[in-house]
Amino acid sequence: MSIPGFGSAEKVNHTASSVTLTIPQSYEWRIEVPFNRILKFKVLTGIVEINGTELANNTEIQLSGTKTYLYSPVTDAVIEYVLVENKDDLSLVSASDEGFVEYLSDESNMDSILNLHMYLESKRQYTKDYNFSSSIDQQQSGPKVLIIGSKYSGKTTVSKILSAYANKMNNTPVLVNLQPRDGVFALPGSLTATPISDSFDVESCNGYGLTTTSGTLVHNPKQPIVKNFGMADFNDNVDFYKLLIEKLGIAVLSRLDQDLNIKNSGVIIDTPALTSKNFDIVESMVSNFLIDNIIVIGNERLAIELTKKFAYKSTQLNIIKLNKSSGCIEVEDRFIRLQQEQTIKEYFNGNFKTRLSPFKTDIELSGLKIYKNVLTKDLLSQMAFLPGGDDFEKDETNPEEDPEKKQLEKYYQAIEDPNSSNLENSIVAITHLPNNDKKLGKDLLNTSVLGYIHVSKFDDQKKRLKVLFPFPGVFPKNVLISTNIGYNE
């Protein structure tokens, strides 16, 4: 495995020829950079943004494995770029990667997004003025925005832009990620909530940045609240997904009450692809986060149906339609998986700009409590073998049966026989919950993630795990959760 920052891409850079490009005002320079290439560029003149984050002039930016665009909002901008071979991540790339794609487009929906931002900013300003002269128990919250839409509609891009623009106005909105496929200041398989107090790091593999690490960072490190879902698709266990939405909603609303600046700034929520068939999930998001603005991207029918279904909240809930950008494209499953692997690698090793020093060691299996998230299909398979009429409900004839344990079994099950087949090459979440917790059932559903380890090897004979930590230290004796997210170094 190559160490980020020690590849030989710099040698190629001296021989590659640079290209100078002018991005006209209000144009987008749309780019698709494969994982086997690195796009290095500088903004020479003008103002250029990536997903709302303004780029510094005459400062080299590196992008790899991304599909995004550069936007010139005010005047014509001039950039200079060069494309070089990616020598750092040979484990992720292959000769079958698509080539570099770039083109200019004047079909931008940035004006609509800017209008939306100004609307939300007016709400924030009203909230600030009101809260300034109000007692604590009468204070209001800034706009809480839920962004929904169909697949490949640009929801994540809009959430980044709105968060970045809000931060430019000295706000600290809470960015909530309810798309477990993506790792937002965490690893894939998680749901997170993060106060955005600084600009995003556009050079990180997913365009967000790093959390608190053992090294120094250019941007302020983010400290998210992380809930472990353990799967990449919310359909793998919808009941568990809705339960985590409820738990994360409680944590976010509590965070708003603790910090007036965050409360004034509000919440911005990114979601997976949802349709009218997922109304129960949308309703869960609206009720648990006290949503007052729903942004529907590129799906007028969905907007109309939501307006009808939320008619009883018409005075409390605004449903806003937003045009889908013509730059939205379908993303292949292989590309998504490569991004997930890169996110995991960056969590442990850092990137070309921030090199981290992960710690590899062996730990004893004895004394560890390891749980595994439950897939709905596996739970239904178990129920199929029960006697007719039986289920997992409490048995009234058995007074010793623990109802909390029964509830836990729908979401987590203890790994009774940890071995190489169920732990090797997996990502394991370390919870805040100590091993000796007496209310394990209830507390495991309420707890958050402290960090992650990677189990690279399991010795079935010696019952020892070879694990990778993000930093050196004593392994905490906390409850562990083995996720469905696999990873090979």
Curated annotation (Swiss-Prot):
ATP binds at E28, Y152, S153, G154, K155, T156, T157. GO terms for molecular function: ATP binding; polynucleotide 5'-hydroxyl-kinase activity. Keywords: ATP-binding, mRNA processing, Nucleotide-binding, Nucleus. Pfam families: Clp1, CLP1_N, CLP1_P. InterPro entries: Clp1 (IPR028606), Clp1/Grc3 (IPR045116), Clp1_C (IPR010655), Clp1_C_sf (IPR038238), Clp1_N (IPR032324), Clp1_N_sf (IPR038239), CLP1_P (IPR032319), P-loop_NTPase (IPR027417). It comes from the Eukaryota. GO terms for biological process: mRNA 3'-end processing; response to xenobiotic stimulus; tRNA splicing, via endonucleolytic cleavage and ligation. One of its GO terms (cellular component) is mRNA cleavage factor complex. It is found in: Nucleus. Component of a pre-mRNA cleavage factor complex. Interacts directly with PCF11. HAMAP family: Clp1 (MF_03035). Required for endonucleolytic cleavage during polyadenylation-dependent pre-mRNA 3'-end formation. Belongs to the Clp1 family. Clp1 subfamily. This is mRNA cleavage and polyadenylation factor CLP1. It comes from Candida albicans (strain SC5314 / ATCC MYA-2876) (Yeast).
